[in-house]
Each structure stands twice: as C-alpha cells, then as structure tokens.
Curated annotation (Swiss-Prot):
Domain of life: Bacteria
Compartmental location: Cytoplasm
EC number: 2.3.1.234
Amino acids binding substrate: L135, V136, S137, G138, G139, D169, G182, D186, N278
Originating organism: Rhodococcus jostii (strain RHA1)
CC per GO annotation: cytoplasm
Main location per the UniProt record: cytoplasm
Record's catalysed reaction(s): L-threonylcarbamoyladenylate + adenosine(37) in tRNA = N(6)-L-threonylcarbamoyladenosine(37) in tRNA + AMP + H(+)
Name the record gives this protein: tRNA N6-adenosine threonylcarbamoyltransferase
GO biological process: tRNA threonylcarbamoyladenosine modification
Keywords on record: Acyltransferase, Cytoplasm, Iron, Metal-binding, Transferase, tRNA processing
Coiled-coil residue windows: none
Cofactor(s) needed: Fe(2+)
Family note: Belongs to the KAE1 / TsaD family.
Length: 345
C-alpha cells in the first residue's frame, strides 16, 4: 500500500509518499517541501494570507515532484492535514487532496496534523510503543499519551498562553535576530552562558497543573530585562540572553515531559515539532531521559518540521488499523482537537 500525504497547515507545502511495510513502519518514497518562510521573514512572522497564496502556487508542482521522485503515477490512498492550523492554508491542501482523490479514484483520509508529528518517528525508529510525546512548534506545545497510532491520542497538557516556538520567535524579534526565531536564538546561544540570567520557569509551582505550560511570563521577563539594561545605559549580551532564555524553555519542557512519562507509566518519550530541532532541548531531553531510565526517540530535524511524510505515515497507520475513508464533503477544522486522529464527515 502506497500513501501520499499533503501538509499545508502553516507555511510549508509538504507532499510525502510512503509505502506501508506491514510491521508498523513505512518506507519513505518521496519527501518534497516548498517553504514560504523567506516571504514571511519580511514581516517578522507568518502572515496567513501570504501563506495561503504560497500554498496555491506550490501545491500542484510539489505533488508532481513527489510522484516523480517516488516513480509512481498515483498512490493507493491520499491523506491530508484537516487541522489544526491556519484556516486559509488548510483549505488549499484539503481542496487539492479532494480533487486528486476524486480524479484518481483513491480513498481519502482527513487526518490530524499533531498526530502526524508523532507518527513520523516510526520511519526512523521503528514501530511505536506506548509513549508520551512532547510536541513543540510555533503554534503548538502539547504533552500527549499515545497507546496506539490508530487509536485516539490523549492530551495530558498544553500551553495556557504562548506556544514555546512562538515565544522563541517573539524573543528573537526583541533581540533583533530575525525570523524564524528558533534557529537564530539557538545559534546565538552557543556563545552565551545559560546560567547568566535566572529567567522564570512558568507553571512549575506545587499548585500549578502538572502537565501544562506557560511561556508568556518568560517572554515578558526577557523584555523587562532588556528594558532595564537599556534604561541603565548598559550593553545587553545577546548570547547570554539567548542562552538563558533557551535554558528556561528547555528546562520546563523536558522536566514536565519526563514527569508525564512517569505519571502514565510508559518508558518512551518521543519529541516532535519544529522547535525540537533546538540543540538545548534535545541535549537536556537526552540527559534527563538517561537519568530517568527512559528511551528517547527524536526524528531527524527534517522530519520534525512540517512535512507531507508525517501525514502519509499517519494515514498509513490509520488505514492499517481498519479506519474507513473520510467523505469528500469533510471540511477543514483550524481548531481540531488532538484527540481526533481522523475526521470522517
């Protein structure tokens, strides 16, 4: 069984093609991505209208490239991100997927973007055991309990305000590091002291929700620190600020992820989402998982960011689990809950 996946929830137009191996894994046949990040960089962040127009221009050429790389005329099934994401961006991918599914006369599966970030790990590390997944990106920060990729995912916790990746972008903009902020902050932090500034760790008190996150206070603390230095006529050390901010984010993310794994009784932690490409998040996760006796699974950075392969992979797992196709009348859902792996109608 060969499955094509289409991803258009934000600023990447991704088309991936996989072959289901029948053992809980997929073989990667094609992974084509067209990104509009350079267009958004001019505005300091993702502009929904710009993203939608970029998807319109890129979707068909990207699909054609993926088919050519895979060496096939059409897939056996087609999966698409139905949500969550930007409304206009989702609409482009869903419309294309419906049109091609009808033209090719292949089954159509409307699947969850967040579930794809978990599923894609199986391409690199094999069948997925029961696990806790930490998903971190510009729009999402979630702790998930995954028993089976073909079954509903349980959300253990999420951010109550800013996503971690969003905080990275805002702090990078404050420091004049440009967009996207994650890679820029990570690079700046390499020359800084992560213990230089004691930035706060949000929602880590004894009365706070064990598995939820908050990054707005941290973002504000960085802004106030910079303002205080400027008022005093002192020079800010951008590397120290970047390293200290990055440490505060990584500290909370990894501490709560390990805690969640212990709480639900699993021995595997999976990282996913574009922000998990951050070097400090990965390093601290490795350190804390080793101390806790947990197995850490982290896909290579290309598979952590948005791509069509993750959607094809989730579609393949759902099909193998006996899921019925979605109706072509299904509508995209920008606010789709992570507990809904597939939308049928």
């Amino acid at each position: 069984m060969i499955v094509m996946g289409i991803e258009s929830s934000c600023d990447e137009t991704g088309v991936g093609i996989v072959r289901w191996n029948g053992d809980g894994t997929c073989e990667l046949l094609a992974d084509e991505v067209a990104s509009s990040v350079e267009e958004h960089a001019r505005y300091g962040g993702v502009v929904p209208e710009v993203a939608s127009r970029a998807h319109l221009e890129a979707i068909v050429p990207t699909m054609r490239r993926a088919l050519a790389v895979a060496g096939i005329a059409k897939p056996d099934a087609l999966a698409v991100t139905i949500g969550p994401g930007l409304a206009g961006a989702l609409l482009v991918g869903v419309a294309a997927a419906k049109a091609y599914a009808a033209a090719w006369d292949v089954p159509f599966y409307a699947v969850n973007h967040l579930g794809g970030h978990v599923s894609v790990d199986t391409l690199e590390h094999g069948p997925m055991p029961p696990c806790v997944a930490l998903l971190v990106s510009g729009g999402h920060t979630h702790l998930l309990h995954v028993e089976d990729l073909a079954k509903p995912i349980v959300e253990l916790g999420t951010t109550v305000d800013d996503a971690a990746g969003e905080a990275f972008d805002k702090v990078a903009r404050l420091l004049g590091l440009g967009f996207p902020g994650g890679p820029a902050l990570d690079a700046a932090a390499q020359d800084g002291d992560r213990n230089a500034i004691p930035f706060p760790r949000g929602m880590t008190g004894p009365r706070d929700a064990r598995h939820d996150f908050s990054f707005s206070g941290l973002k504000t603390a960085v802004a106030r620190y910079v303002e205080s230095k400027e008022r005093a006529g002192e020079v800010c050390s951008v590397p120290d600020i970047a390293a200290s901010f990055q440490e505060a984010v990584a500290d909370v993310l990894t501490m709560k992820a390990v805690r969640a794994a212990r709480d639900v009784g699993v021995d595997t932690l999976v990282l996913g989402g574009g922000a998990t490409a951050n070097s400090r998040i990965r390093a601290l996760a490795e350190e804390r998982c080793a101390d806790a006796g947990l197995t850490l699974r982290v896909p290579k950075p290309r598979l952590c960011t948005d791509n069509g392969v993750m959607i094809a992979s989730l579609g393949a797992h759902l099909i193998a689990g006996g899921a019925a196709p979605s109706l072509l009348t299904v509508a995209s859902d920008p606010g789709l809950s992570v507990a809904t792996s597939q939308v049928f109608s």
